């Protein structure tokens, strides 16, 4: 009998700590029999990360035998998984209840198990999504309640991960998936997994809450080429084992069929082929399969409507007719955004297919490309909108069938954490290496179960910790160098290889190029390379055979590269020590290790461990730091591919510049111009060809140099061998700030393409900083030796002498006694621009620059600073300090200042004669305003301003420079009397001039 129970509210008095991920320290005590003995343990990592986890107590040790309650009502597969775990850990199940034993209660929400509700103490799976569960371990009891049978099974998997050496923390967990369908599509080309591999994988999926396994191996003939034919009897037995194992582990076994290679759609032949499709599905249905997929991927035929019609008919006549089959799954012929969409609109096939295919059918797509760096939310939104449904993802990582020499050992990376808004079905395509695929699959389980809390770095570390135990740290060192998949053409995916180590390498090159001390960093890198070799040797000696068989060649490859990296450091140290013999010895080792690595099938750490050797072999202490060089080109390709000119001087052999080839193409002539950060004495240009293609490889060149970027002098012309090796163009030392490489010939991988394209991985310059001659100079300062109080004095400043430079700008500070002088203004001379500012009392900063583009003249006054003498002072000092000039190269040179003494004497005050204004009259009369004008008095010595009156009342005082005033806000057609008087500095006011008038009507 079953009934739905009302769950009691949580009343626990324990302090709770919420966690999302990671390790938690807690105290564990034994329950039942209390010993009083306490030990510190860790709540282990869990995968996938639970949605909610609370620590509610100290934890306890599970007794050697337990009371098991609910096993008859609970999901059979969940109980079987629990019993298997208990047996493996030597924990027996009591035949009768023992109050001194740990009690474990298990069941689903609808089961009538009072003990389960009591142990849950208010925590419940009742309101969770399908496949959710609640798990409570507290006070010697463990309760696992599933929302459904799948949820109970997943609760058992979490319980298994929680228990370490019979210790379990006291926790409350409520957990449920973000994405409904989570799992694997075995859809890679190449060697299919063995039957043993698949059985092992299916168990692994169940343990990590993955519920979908799509059986679609490209090299299974009965899936693709022989899709019409039934499986032979021996194959049917194998298939039955997979189906049964999937059911036991709560994994939907999805049988995939790919009929598109030769299916017939019309007439009797079409009907015959459709019946073959039904018959194939019927045979699998009879074996227990309840999920099916029909794929149209990787075929030439683009009959969109017919593809969709086959699906719709199969959906009606088989899927819906059966009643217990899950929604049909498909992959269209256009299955990535690049193929599906053009200019934001669906292409013809995708539009017709999307309009025709039944809304209940799951449609898979791979993201922006077939193998791509990311799925941004915008991309998912676009495709979901076209198909008007939540999409299913076929994520092509960690698959390696397009780049077989490398292993993909990284985490899920580049996937938006809000993807579940448009996706409710997430699968990954694994490698043919089943065991090593588990690292990425482990992180895929975490991402798809708890998307919002996914952290790719934590997930990756946790996966390796849980999969490799004592070898985890060694495996992290190895796998860290094999996470990025990049076949140099259309496929790029995964986290970059060893990003922290790559950053240290880049820092080393920067320090060496900048002539900084790099000794500590070199020692650190020696340690890194030694650790790489040690880790790989440990793995070779201790990895289980199934894993070692899959990675032994890559382990050997990384050992070789680590040895080459150490030899590369030896080369650098020898260069620093100017030890030619040691350098040549280390160089030979490094080159041999690189050659061995490049000739191997195995690929690993191309842009890190391998690239470091290549960089070291081409490194020269005379190399001018590429990252300080500004580089421009006759053209660059930034539309068809990301290949700007800057990539030819970034220190990275894996990037490159390409002349513009997208429409409209630039077919020549081609050139690169490098602007150095200073003037150098150069003698060599390095050209590193693009490493992944010969297209645009430079075979003819002309090198020219310049000091000003406009006038270039040719220093070398010649030809280069047509291969991928680094080339050096050497010539007699010459001074240069600009270096131009003109392409006179290049090769192409296209017919008639010679000379039309140009590429370069790196173009670098070697030389030494030009030691500039010392620039010296002095300042001139001209002023009268004596000035009267109240008078202005002009202080003329210029460049007296300048040696080994020409000045295009001049910056100085004029200092004066603020009690003796007041700053008035600065005056420029012809052909120069002067900008002056009083920066504080007694200091004026003056900037002088050329207006003509010619150098500033020497031995001339360039600027005049006007000061007013304010007080009698004997021997007041004027000085020029902080004096510097800017030359034509943009360099600044300090030059010597100077000083001068000026005496300020009392002056005789001139006689002030008071006179009235002249010609006082109205120039404009309006209704409300009257404007009056006048001429200044006959004598102006001491004149300070004017006082204006209206009808006998003073209305304004204005300055002496004014000769007009407007009386405003007057009444219309009214008589007014206006007067004006001149005011003088001795306090006297002149007689008033008068004017009477009437405003306008």
Swiss-Prot record:
Residues binding a protein, per UniProt: 187, 218, 297, 335, 394-396, 401, 429
Role this protein plays: Binds carbohydrates. Capable of hydrolyzing the glycosidic link of O-GlcNAcylated proteins. Can bind and deglycosylate O-glycosylated peptides from mammals. Can use p-nitrophenyl-beta-GlcNAc and 4-methylumbelliferone-GlcNAc as substrates (in vitro).
Enzyme Commission no: 3.2.1.169
Record field: catalytic activity: 3-O-(N-acetyl-beta-D-glucosaminyl)-L-seryl-[protein] + H2O = N-acetyl-D-glucosamine + L-seryl-[protein]; 3-O-(N-acetyl-beta-D-glucosaminyl)-L-threonyl-[protein] + H2O = L-threonyl-[protein] + N-acetyl-D-glucosamine
GO biological process, one term: carbohydrate derivative metabolic process
GO MF assignments: [protein]-3-O-(N-acetyl-D-glucosaminyl)-L-serine/L-threonine O-N-acetyl-alpha-D-glucosaminase activity; carbohydrate binding; hexosaminidase activity
Keyword annotations of the record: Coiled coil, Glycosidase, Hydrolase, Signal
Signal peptide start-end: 1-30
Family the entry assigns: Belongs to the glycosyl hydrolase 84 family.
Source species taxonomy: Bacteria, Bacillati, Bacillota, Clostridia, Eubacteriales
Region of interest (Catalytic domain), residue spans: 179-469
Domain of life of the source: Bacteria
CDD domains: cohesin_like, FN3
Record domain Fibronectin type-III: where: 916-1001
Catalytic residues identified in the record: 298
Annotated protein name in UniProt: O-GlcNAcase NagJ
Keyword Electron transport: no
Span of domain GH84: 180-452
Record flagged with keyword Membrane: no
The encoding gene: nagJ
Entry coiled-coil feature ranges: 515-543, 573-597
């Amino acid at each position: 009998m079953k009934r739905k129970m009302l769950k009691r509210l949580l009343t626990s008095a324990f302090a709770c700590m919420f966690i999302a991920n990671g390790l938690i320290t807690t105290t564990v005590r034994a329950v039942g029999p209390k010993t009083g003995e306490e030990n510190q343990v860790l709540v282990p990592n869990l995968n996938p990360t639970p949605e909610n986890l609370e620590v509610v107590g100290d934890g306890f040790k599970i007794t050697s035998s337990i009371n098991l309650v609910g096993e008859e009502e609970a999901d059979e597969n969940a109980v079987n998984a629990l019993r298997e775990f208990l047996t493996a850990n030597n924990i027996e199940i009591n035949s009768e209840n023992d109050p001194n034993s740990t009690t474990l209660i298990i069941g689903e929400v609808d089961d009538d198990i009072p003990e389960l509700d009591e142990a849950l103490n208010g925590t419940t799976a009742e309101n969770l999504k399908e496949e959710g569960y609640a798990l409570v371990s507290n006070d010697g009891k463990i309760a696992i309640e599933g929302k459904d049978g799948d949820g109970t099974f997943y609760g058992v998997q979490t319980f298994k991960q929680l228990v370490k050496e019979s210790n379990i923390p006291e926790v409350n967990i409520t957990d449920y998936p973000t994405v409904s369908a989570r799992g694997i599509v075995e859809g890679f080309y190449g060697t299919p997994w063995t039957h043993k591999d698949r059985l092992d994988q299916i168990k692994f999926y169940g343990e990590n809450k993955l519920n979908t396994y799509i059986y679609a191996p490209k090299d299974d003939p009965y899936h693709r080429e022989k899709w019409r034919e039934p499986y032979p009897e021996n194959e049917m037995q194998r298939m039955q084992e997979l189906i049964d194992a999937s059911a036991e582990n709560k994994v939907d076994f999805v049988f995939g069929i790919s009929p598109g290679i030769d299916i017939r759609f019309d007439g009797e032949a079409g009907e015959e082929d459709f019946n073959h499709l039904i018959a194939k599905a019927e045979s699998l249905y009879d074996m227990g399969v309840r999920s099916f997929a029909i794929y149209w991927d990787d075929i030439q035929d683009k009959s969109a409507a017919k593809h969709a019609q086959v699906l719709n008919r199969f959906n009606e006549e088989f899927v819906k007719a059966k009643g217990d089959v899950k929604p049909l799954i498909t992959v269209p012929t256009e299955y990535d955004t690049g193929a599906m969409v053009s200019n934001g609109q669906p292409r013809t096939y995708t539009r017709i297919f999307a309009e025709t295919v039944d809304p209940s059918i799951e449609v898979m797509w791979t993201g922006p490309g077939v193998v791509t760096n990311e799925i941004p939310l915008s991309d998912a939104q676009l495709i979901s909108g076209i198909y008007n449904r939540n999409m299913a993802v076929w994520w092509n990582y960690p698959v390696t069938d397009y780049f077989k020499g490398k292993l993909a050992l990284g985490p899920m990376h580049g996937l938006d954490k809000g993807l579940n808004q448009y996706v409710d079905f997430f699968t990954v395509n694994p490698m043919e290496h089943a065991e090593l695929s588990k690292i990425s699959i482990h992180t895929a389980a975490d991402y798809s179960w708890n998307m919002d809390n996914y952290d790719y770095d934590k997930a990756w570390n946790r996966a390796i910790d849980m999969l490799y135990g004592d070898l985890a740290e060694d495996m992290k060192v190895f796998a860290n160098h094999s996470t990025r998949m990049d076949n140099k053409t259309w496929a790029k995916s995964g986290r970059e290889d060893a990003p922290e180590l790559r950053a240290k390498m880049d820092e080393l090159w920067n320090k060496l190029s900048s002539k900084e001390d790099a000794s500590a960093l070199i020692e650190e890198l020696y340690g890194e390379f030694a650790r790489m070799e040690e880790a790989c040797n440990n793995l070779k000696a201790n990895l289980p055979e199934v894993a070692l068989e899959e990675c032994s060649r890559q382990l050997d490859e990384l050992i070789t590269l680590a040895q080459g990296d150490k030899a590369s450091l030896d080369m650098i140290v020898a260069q620093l020590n100017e030890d030619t013999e040691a350098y040549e010895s280390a160089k030979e080792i490094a080159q041999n290790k690189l050659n061995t690595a490049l000739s191997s099938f195995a690929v690993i750490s191309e842009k890190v461990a391998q690239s470091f050797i290549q960089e070291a072999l081409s490194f020269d202490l005379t190399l001018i730091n590429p990252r300080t060089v500004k580089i421009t080109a006759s053209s660059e390709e930034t539309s068809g591919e990301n290949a700007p000119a800057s990539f030819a001087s970034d220190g990275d052999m894996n990037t490159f510049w390409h002349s513009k080839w997208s429409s409209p193409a630039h077919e020549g002539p081609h050139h690169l111009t490098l602007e150095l950060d200073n003037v150098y004495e150069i003698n060599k240009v390095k050209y590193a060809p693009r490493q992944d293609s010969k297209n645009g490889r430079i075979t003819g060149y002309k090198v020219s140099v310049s000091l000003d970027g406009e006038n270039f002098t040719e220093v070398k012309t010649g030809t280069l061998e047509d291969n991928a090796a680094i080339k050096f163009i050497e010539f007699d030392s010459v001074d240069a700030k600009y270096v131009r490489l003109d392409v006179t010939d290049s090769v192409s991988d296209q017919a008639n393409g010679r000379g039309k394209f140009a590429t370069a991985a790196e173009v670098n310059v070697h030389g030494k900083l030009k030691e500039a001659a010392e620039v010296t100079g002095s300042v001139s300062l001209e002023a009268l030796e004596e000035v009267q109080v109240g008078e202005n004095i002009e202080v003329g400043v210029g460049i007296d002498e300048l040696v080994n430079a020409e000045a295009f700008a001049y910056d100085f500070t004029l200092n004066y006694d603020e009690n003796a002088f007041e700053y008035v203004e600065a005056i420029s001379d012809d052909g120069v621009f002067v900008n002056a500012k009083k920066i504080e009392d007694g200091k004026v900063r003056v900037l002088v620059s050329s207006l003509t583009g010619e150098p500033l003249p020497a031995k001339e006054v360039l600027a005049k600073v006007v000061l007013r003498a304010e007080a009698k002072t004997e021997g007041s000092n004027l000085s020029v300090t902080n004096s510097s000039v800017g030359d034509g190269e943009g360099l600044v040179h300090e030059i010597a200042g100077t000083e001068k003494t000026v005496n300020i004497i009392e002056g005789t005050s001139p006689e002030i004669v008071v006179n009235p204004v002249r010609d006082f009259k109205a120039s404009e009369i309006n209704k409300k305003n009257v404007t009056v004008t006048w001429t200044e008095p006959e004598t102006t010595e001491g004149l300070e301003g004017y006082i204006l009156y209206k009808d006998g009342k003073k209305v304004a005082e204005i300055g002496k420079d004014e000769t007009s005033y407007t009386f405003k806000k007057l009444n219309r057609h009214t008589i007014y009397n206006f007067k004006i008087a001149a005011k003088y500095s001795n306090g006297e006011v002149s007689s008033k001039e008068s004017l009477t008038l009437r405003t306008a009507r």
